Amino acid sequence: MIAKVIVDVASKSVDYKFDYIIPEQLESVIQPGVRVIVPFGPRTIQGYVMEVTAEPDAQLDVSKLKKIIEVKDIQPELTSELISLSEWMGSTHIIKRISMLEVMLPSAIKAKYKKAFKMKDEIEVPSALLQKFDKHGYYYYKDAQKNNDIQLLMKLLKDDIVEEKTILTQNITKKTKRAVRVIEGYHPDEVLAKLEKVIKQYDLYAYLSEEQHKTIFLTDIEDMGFSKSSLDGLIKKGYVEKYDAVVERDPFKDRVFEQESKQQLTEDQFKAYEAIKAKIVSQEQETFLLHGVTGSGKTEVYLQTIEDVLSQGKQAMMLVPEIALTPQMVLRFKRRFGDDVAVLHSGLSNGERYDEWQKIRDGRARVSVGARSSVFAPFKNLGLIIIDEEHESTYKQEDYPRYHAREIAQWRSEYHHCPVILGSATPCLESYARAEKGVYHLLSLPNRVNQQALPEIDIVDMREELSEGNRSMFSKDLREAIQLRLDRQEQVVLFLNRRGYASFMLCRDCGYVPQCPNCDISLTYHKTTDLLKCHYCGYQETPPNQCPNCESEHIRQVGTGTQKVEELLQQEFEDARIIRMDVDTTSKKGAHEKLLTEFEKGNGDILLGTQMIAKGLDYPNITLVGVLNADTMLNLPDFRASERTYQLLTQVAGRAGRHEKAGQVIIQTYNPDHYSILDVQKNDYLTFYRQEMEYRKLGKYPPYYYLINFTISHKEMKKVMEASQHVHKILLQHLTEKALVLGPSPAALARINNEFRFQILVKYKSEPGLLQAIQFLDDYYHEKFIKEKLALKIDIDPQMMM
């Protein structure tokens, strides 16, 4: 038998299946989807079995094939569906197969490779060095570097006293805990008869034999009052043994979830629910765009359709942007479906995430709630896929391998013949245009549940505030509104849009701004560490006391970060309890949930935060939302800037007045006449959509045209320019005259990490030769560009244009 294996080497030259002989003793356990250890050149590496055949390819010499060394899994980590998906993504998006397979799996099961020196001749190794080798005769390269032993080891390598080895290790470790069990082979009644005179041992054995189906930990026995001597006595007699029991890492093990019953649907909700249910029952693929205003009850529609899926014996997947994966959202699912829910997001440890993933693979969890990468959850019988806040750009992975969760969800829904729901209060233009064309089925929820009115939205022109002498970041209206809520003991949410509005240092005399020496961007000031940092390459420095350019002492922080706003708020409202939510305050595990719980309990009056407070908050006492700087995103060099401003402001505004108490939203802006801000005030998505579509049509942008962005980078400007011209020429040769090939031109961020960046943007409607052109460029890059250390990034359907 032959296994066709994709090896764990991220190189274009080995991006195909290698044939390996399956040893006879492994034939019964090796199947597609399992991980195996195989010899590859001089190394031993991990691979994934893609298929099993009786015979190798005709042109191969069987005598030269190597054997699989070891199989890592009892059952496959990859389903046959995920294998097919990786093949499809590899061929349509020009992604290496191994890169696609690894993004599908939890990081805990990815192989780690450690470079080491292996002792060959112990006698010849100097005694001072000998003690640094472990019991297996290895001295790891990293340790040798730390200890300054590399030079000596390289000499020993040359003299054939040591050899270089690459050691394969696993990230994954099972969590275990000491437990106790009865030894099989004895009849309990016979043992108990022998223990009648030793009462405590009798009681302990009786308990253990009755609870054989359960895992009994040592700590459980101690808690029940059984003594150590009683246990030791039973072990000595050979009736009981200690062992290491595998413990599942459940991030919610200490939580009790009250069961939640389904809510009565409104007429609009019921219509949407019925349309989706029909496709669940008939097992047909259809994409629904659920367009509902904030607070219209989209989540309840999701929950009730999932109930129908589970009643049919099928499974459901719910995707939520990482930023909106709030404890409140998880709580609703856990209350409705209990242990049937697995949660997958970056806040979990590697072990917790792997155990949640295994629950899905083994069929113990039938519902997943997770961020972007959970779209690859190993369900075998999907009945529904939901993408909440479908407009979010974070559903596109910006790093290699680049993929969009929506596209993966569509592929999987076709594979399983099940519907997809794309839900949003502010759908992306591409999705709404598809719904208008009939490609998607549009479902509308135009009203909030319980006849609750949408909040009143007021726009404050900050230019007028400035002309009236108010240089503060709080307008007169916002100040008064905050004070009113504090007097009424109601809660306030204040949103600071940090995108394009970070704090930096500025010399008031000459205008000097400290720049990153490696990137074309100003350094951001962080008050907690009192450092200037670059968010692109990680460079940091101490803020100068005087200007390096003109030696003036008038150099200070400009722009307002959340910490500065918190200080100003505390000065304005001395008695207010302020909870700040940003990257700094939520970096520790569980901090996000802890802060929100405090606010929900009423232990905070004002919640101040960045984008992470824009979604998912549904608290009855929030009656005021203030947007401190509405238009900073409008100034970004991106054709989606207006759309993202509209979406973000609408989402933030939706946090106010969701229950009995009426809500108010105050938006502070220097662009009060901009259509994206005016349409938020009117809560008029369709007017915004029509206006923005006109601009997209004029500019030949999506949804009228598709885009591909090519970014070429290198440390030398001359090489970047030459390579960019070459890429441009290749594209013109392969594409028709209808395609627009723009550039090459410097990227908006023209230098990052000391590398110059040029971009070529292709706009097209239908290009039969496009895939061939991308394939040709990818091949050309691996043949020519890599040698020159040139980087080529091919971004299909780019979400970020910087």
Where are these regions (language model features)?
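Short, flexible, solvent-exposed loop/turn segments with mixed acidic/basic and small polar residues
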Residues: 8, 129-131, 697-702, 747-752
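Short amphipathic alpha-helix segments
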Residues: 683-686, 721-742
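Short, intrinsically disordered low-complexity segments
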Residues: 35-37, 44, 743-768
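Inter-lobe coupling/hinge segments of SF2-like helicase ATPases
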Residues: 260-266, 270, 283-721, 760, ...
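Short beta-strand elements
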Residues: 734-747, 786-797
